[in-house]
Regions:
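Acceptor-binding helix/loop patch of EC 2.4 sugar-transfer enzymes
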Residues: 1-35
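A short, active-site helix/loop in glycosyltransferases that binds the activated sugar's phosphate group
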Residues: 34-65, 74
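Short acidic alpha-helix that forms the nucleotide-activated donor recognition element
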Residues: 39-42, 140, 158-169, 197
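Acidic donor-binding loop of glycosyltransferase active sites
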Residues: 45, 166-185
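Carbohydrate-associated surface elements
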Residues: 53, 71, 83
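Short beta-strand->alpha-helix junction loop in the catalytic core
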Residues: 69-78
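Conserved donor-binding/catalytic core segment of Leloir-type glycosyltransferases
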Residues: 81-103, 107-110
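Nucleotide-activated donor-binding/catalytic signature segment of Leloir-type glycosyltransferases, i.e.
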Residues: 123-130, 135-163
Length: 197
């Protein structure tokens, strides 16, 4: 959903030319993608989406837009309480940009709790299951807040491993953006619904 992004995070690869040329290419690419999408929407019998905000956007192109709610499959995910010796905060997924998912409040809280001698890295961990690009963003922010010693990074794991990882966690982390009229709209990560389980 291109309109939800604050910038150009929906483009999987950067162009790596001159900055002015990148901006021109991106603007043309966005316009072309939206035109193709909107043309397809106009001829669709029905359109479904998971965001009330997006329903309103898509109704501009097709009056038959339906809202479906996100969730989890109880046959694949059975909540358990597994005790561990550490307090573990877990995040699974991508972090495309700080405009969409921002860990700043978490990192500030960890820094404050460390300063107040409430937590130590040996018993308090934030575990990230992300791609390399996301890890780069997270590392930079963690270092900026002085909380890198609390972080653990892992590659993606098969979907079948996720329920056990979630069940071993003390807290499941859902990141979002701060509300601003110019920021992305309608984002609610599916991780939120996994967390509710």
């Amino acid at each position: 959903i291109i309109e939800q992004y604050a910038s150009n995070e929906y483009i999987s690869h950067k162009f790596h030319t001159f900055s002015w040329l990148d901006a021109f290419i991106t603007k043309r690419f966005r316009k072309r993608l939206l035109k193709k999408r909107n043309n397809a929407l106009e001829v669709a019998d029905c359109v479904t989406t998971v965001s009330p905000w997006h329903v309103e956007v898509l109704k501009q192109y097709n009056p038959n837009v339906r809202l479906i709610y996100n969730g989890f499959d109880p046959e694949l995910f059975y909540p358990q309480q597994i005790k561990t010796s550490r307090f573990i905060i877990t995040y699974t997924g991508r972090l495309l940009s700080l405009a969409i998912r921002n860990p700043e409040l978490l990192f500030a809280a960890i820094a404050r709790l460390t300063e107040d001698k409430v937590i130590i890295p040996e018993t308090f961990r934030v575990v990230w299951y992300t791609d390399q690009e996301s890890r780069s963003i997270i590392r930079q922010e963690a270092e900026r807040h002085g909380v890198q010693s609390f972080m653990d990074y892992h590659e993606y794991v098969p979907a079948s491993d996720i329920p056990l990882i979630l069940n071993k966690s003390s807290v499941l982390l859902s990141l979002t953006n701060k509300f601003d009229t110019s920021d992305p709209k309608g984002f609610m990560t599916t991780k939120f619904f996994e967390s509710l389980a």
